[in-house]
Amino acid sequence: MSNFFKICCVKDPGGSAKENLRKMDQVNGHFVSATCPFSGESVELKVDSNQKQVKPNLRIKVPQPIRLKNHVAHDENFDTLHSRINEVTHFNTKCSEKVCQTSIMDIPGRGDTPRTAEEVFKDAQAFLTQYYASIKRENSEAHKARLDEVKRELKERGTYQLKTSELVFGAKLAWRNATRCIGRIQWKKLQIFDCREVTTASGMFEALCNHIKYATNKGNIRSAITIFPQRTDGKHDYRIWNPQLINYAGYQEPDGSITGDPARVEFTEICMKLGWKAPRTPWDILPLVLSADGKDPEFFELPKEIVMEVQFEHPEYDWFKDMGWKWYALPAVSNMRLACGGLEFTANSFNGWYMGTEIGCRNLCDESRLNIVEAVAKKMGLDTNSFVSLWKDKALVEVNIAVLHSFHRDNVSIVDHHSASEQFQKHLENENKSRGGCPADWIWIVPPMSSSLTTVFHQEMALYYIRPSYDYQEPPWKTHQWTKSDGTKTVHRKFHFKQIARAVKFTSKLFGRALSKRIKATILYATETGKSEHYAKELGTIFGHAFNAQVHCMSEYDMFSIEHETLVLIVASTFGNGEPPANGVDFAEHLFQMLYNETNNNRGDGTSDLGSGTFKTPTPKSLMRSNSMMTPSFEYKRQLTRLESNKSSVAGASSIEQIGPLSNVCFAVFGLGSSAYPKFCHFGKTVDKILGDLGGERILELACGDELYGQEQQFRAWSSKIFQVACETFCLDENGMVKDAKKALGDVPLTEETVRFGKYQGDTKLKAALEASFRKQLITCKVKENKNLGDFSADRATVFVDMQPETEFKYDPGDHVGVLACNRKEIVDAVLERMKDVDDYDKTVQLQVMKETLTPTGAIKTWEQHERLPAVTIRQIFTRFLDITTPPSTTVLKYLSKACTDQNDAAQLKELAIDSNKYDDWRHLHYPHLAEVLAQFPSCRPQASLLAALLPSLQPRFYSISSSPLAHPHRIHITCAVVVYRTQNGQGPMHYGVCSTYLQNLKPEDEALVFIRRAPSFHMPKDLSAPLILVGPGSGIAPFRGFWHHRKHQIKNLIPNKQKPGPVWLFFGCRNRGMDLYKEEKEKALADGVLSKVFLALSREDSVEKKHIQTLLEDEGAEISRMLLDENGHFYVCGDCKMAEEVQQKLKEIMKKHAKMTEQEYEEFILNLMDENRYHEDIFGITLRTAEVQSASREFAKRTRQESQKSQT
């Protein structure tokens, strides 16, 4: 170790070096610099009483690490945390230079004097620095603004409020800093119940009953803390008078003996003085004594049904259970003060679970407690007359064996002292790595039995106190200022738990709602079409009955907050062929990064097992896009449940490495997707797996909703189940509002009485209305040309549309254009004819929804603007804003059944809404639009306003841009396959694709509204020398037309003889030569050298061998392999998902054959291509143009679903 004390003195007896030094002063024969080189302070010569000059003390202390040895492992570590005065808030010990007082019971506190604003701000500053550092925002604008906010609150009110996330962080950190706790390795797994809104003792009681029930969890103990309002002026404190929430009473008998627990005699007398009628048995549960807002205390008897007790028996001694000894399962400390951020929370209760010796040694065998050791020894037949027989030790061991055995028998969480010691050693190692130290009180950490046999006995520890912290405080009966002179109260309250759970028994309805919403439920969604958002908001409405439900889009969510969440629900769509929607990409990458960081931290060497050989470690993006849900080879270990980790002394030691960053987060995932895609619900599955790998507690298995088979019914079933499970998890199942929510689960969310078309004064432009509804900046384009490509037929056409935008815009080849289409006029007119509450379809109206707001004076109902639909005419709503061509959802059918006057119509609609199989068959056979449904059930006359609120939005359709900004400035070209098909297996009415037929029918000078969606993963490489392999059958050629036009202009700008463009190979497929799109253009590009080779696969050409694109790829496999491996080639695929899957499988065969790759090497190879953005996919769903394709698609989707279900089991 280097010298940590520097002395700023130089001795120069000869004076030869004097001129080389700064100005020096001479003190007792030494030359000393006039200023200290470390502090810059000037030197003042001091004179003692004998007029002798005294050398000033210029020693500068640099923080010195404390070396801590382990005398068994023969290793050492160095504690530096104690010296980081700028990062942590210290408070002093009672020890002096001459006397060590660490064995004194009380940790020094600061008394009950309220803190000054200056003292509070100093601690707040230190705490907020730690908080913002934990979320990687230290010294950010948010950090500075928060400090300013705290300073302003302190100036105005003398105190401030911690935000919920800050309180959660502080409560966990206080446990982490608890010097006397051996079980701190679990510090991240602490459920916080924020009860700072509670104002009465009865409210405190209800909250603590909920805490007991939640934490007990039928024996599978969960760590939790309930926190009540902070101290303000010291005159309005909240206090829990009980040392623990559950305690046995102790009674002093006339003969001096004690019945019950001797440690609770004083508090028992307090309870009796307050009016508690004590049964005076050895095992009486003491009532809770609570005081709120500085008022006199009230006592409340705990319901017996929420207090779990363990009756003791011994595995070998039958007489042991006859002794009648028992103990409560939940150790919930309630007499300490939480100091956090300068604030003091005088009323809080926290719990972990027992270490066996806490009961077996301290509670049962201490002489000052139940002291059963002699009774046990005599039952065992031991000689109790001589210490030499070690009868106490033998009896003590058997008592502890009985305790562990009985807890294990009842499946109640407990940990033996050896496992706890191993866990603490691991915690010590983790803390030294993560923050350079761990404050620990050796006297308390070392177990009271078999001390030297545990690892912690031989471990040196550094004891110091840092905040946030849990501090001892004076018992409230010693400090309380009574309003009654005799200090008594006669109110006696005794409740059953069902009464307690109904908050209205104690408080107003408003407060009851506040109590039920202490637990935060964060609902996150990622969506492309808006369906996930709709489901997420619906889920938020359901959870809002019983939780503090907050709904966020993933792109708007602060990912650094996820570690501090309590309950996270994910509703996530999958976009394209397995990728996240655009607003879910950052969320996914952050999750992957968390997993990488956690894994590397666990490894300790900062390396990763991902990848091998010459391939790079795959990035989150490539893992998300990969062909199957790739799992990193490090395979993060499964998170054990609390019961698994602690019910066995063996399991306790083995589970200590399983605590991930999300260990305290409960979660569930609902994935949306289409089984027409091979990577069905891939994004949802990936998120579900990573959340679990990061330590999250999955409270319900992943559910997948299939767009092609009962997605809505699957969501309804899942939402009902997850709500029930969440309520059970957080012990809200008896809450009255929970019952209301469960009742509302099966109802239509809106009614005819809560939705209306309101009057609107003003003029709304259609473009502005669409921009507001779809949250997009739209571009108005004029059609310049619209023509058919290839051979035209009624049921199979592809059109080319040339548009000229009216404003400036930017795009790159490979990007998409979103088109806002119109519903067909005949369908809109047929629907409007059946509406019953509209007299003028062309008058501007505002769709309004009734909202109910709960206030202290009652519920207030107001009409508010619908969040999705702006003020336009009803005809415009059904033409431009609502999807009326997709078969109605079961929610809509449920409402339509209520709008029928004929009972048979109503019954049939209701049956379709309830029976998912019948609905699915009806949907696929008829694929009816709304007008056809109304025609099928003629007595149905719905209300237009309610129907508008229930129908989904008409989503924009996306097309790959077929032009180049270099070749076609100020233009956008679209290549669109027109969708036309007959339902009912080809025998039904003709159906038309909404957007494709809209584009087909546009005439020159017609206007269309569009927007650009970037597709950076499908752009052309900047390196023109890179080979391009383009694969696109049918309309999949669309983006590649833009590529070759763009490439032609790029080649013009190349320096002759210095830059050579790489080869471009185009693989195109169609049925026959008449459908060979852009044939002349391809031939010209080939002649100009822009395209190097063009391959044509004809699948139904007469007199020609039938071929598919995959066959052509196989024929050119050797060259493809060479271009990808040796020339950094790029591989592009555009087409439907089935084709894309088949192409990738063919590429796998090619690389195995020509590059001699194994399965694992190919997986790493494809990941590497994706990482380098050299494998590109532009995928769309299978177009249901014919009965043949529709049937094939459904069979393919069925197989995908079955394979997906197998992979989940």
UniProtKB/Swiss-Prot annotation:
SUPFAM superfamilies: Ferredoxin reductase-like, C-terminal NADP-linked domain, Flavoproteins, Nitric oxide (NO) synthase oxygenase domain, Riboflavin synthase domain-like. FMN binds at residues 527-531, 669-700. NADP(+) binds at residues 1028-1147. (6R)-L-erythro-5,6,7,8-tetrahydrobiopterin binds at S103, W444, F457. L-arginine binds at Q244, W353, Y354, E358, N363. Residues 603-622 are annotated as: Disordered. Expression is dependent on and stimulated by NADPH, calcium, BH4 and calmodulin. The activity is not dependent on FAD and is not stimulated by its presence. InterPro entries: CysJ-like_FAD-binding (IPR003097), FAD-bd_FR_type (IPR017927), Flavdoxin-like (IPR001094), Flavodoxin/NO_synth (IPR008254), Flavoprot_Pyr_Nucl_cyt_Rdtase (IPR001709), Flavoprotein-like_sf (IPR029039), FNR_nucleotide-bd (IPR039261), NADPH_Cyt_P450_Rdtase_alpha (IPR023173). It catalyses: 2 L-arginine + 3 NADPH + 4 O2 + H(+) = 2 L-citrulline + 2 nitric oxide + 3 NADP(+) + 4 H2O. Produces nitric oxide (NO) which is a messenger molecule with diverse functions throughout the body. Involved in the induction of immune gene expression. This is Nitric oxide synthase. The lineage of its organism: Eukaryota, Metazoa, Ecdysozoa, Arthropoda, Hexapoda. The gene is NOS.
